[in-house]
């Protein structure tokens, strides 16, 4: 189980990312449209003035049961440990163990 403070920090980052998503996107589009370098620098300054935690690269995908930050499967939203346990207990319909 991940520490609760880390899980809360990621939730806060997700909220900030959603809040500033459109602002960040519009500023990035403006950078590509503006031909003058001096105008681009002004836009870069605006972009850098946004909160650091609002950048989407600072988000981390976590297991929604345990909060584990590594070995996550996107399709299920689970870490590999919990996914294996749930498949063996037949709690995930349609998931089968591979054998060849």
From Swiss-Prot:
- Could you tell me where this protein is found in the cell? Plastid
Renumbered to this chain, the signal peptide range is: none
Keyword DNA-binding on entry = no
Q: Which GO terms describe its cellular component?
A: plastid; small ribosomal subunit
Q: Which GO terms describe its molecular function?
A: rRNA binding; structural constituent of ribosome
**Top-rank taxon:** Eukaryota
- Keyword annotations for this protein? Plastid, Ribonucleoprotein, Ribosomal protein, RNA-binding, rRNA-binding
Q: Name one GO biological process term.
A: translation
- Known partners and oligomeric status: Part of the 30S ribosomal subunit.
**What does this protein's UniProt record list under function?**
Binds 16S rRNA, required for the assembly of 30S particles.
Q: Which PANTHER family match?
A: 30S RIBOSOMAL PROTEIN S14, SMALL RIBOSOMAL SUBUNIT PROTEIN US14M
Q: Which family does it belong to?
A: Belongs to the universal ribosomal protein uS14 family.
**Which NCBIfam families does the entry link to?**
PRK08881.1 (NF006477)
Q: What is this protein called?
A: Small ribosomal subunit protein uS14c
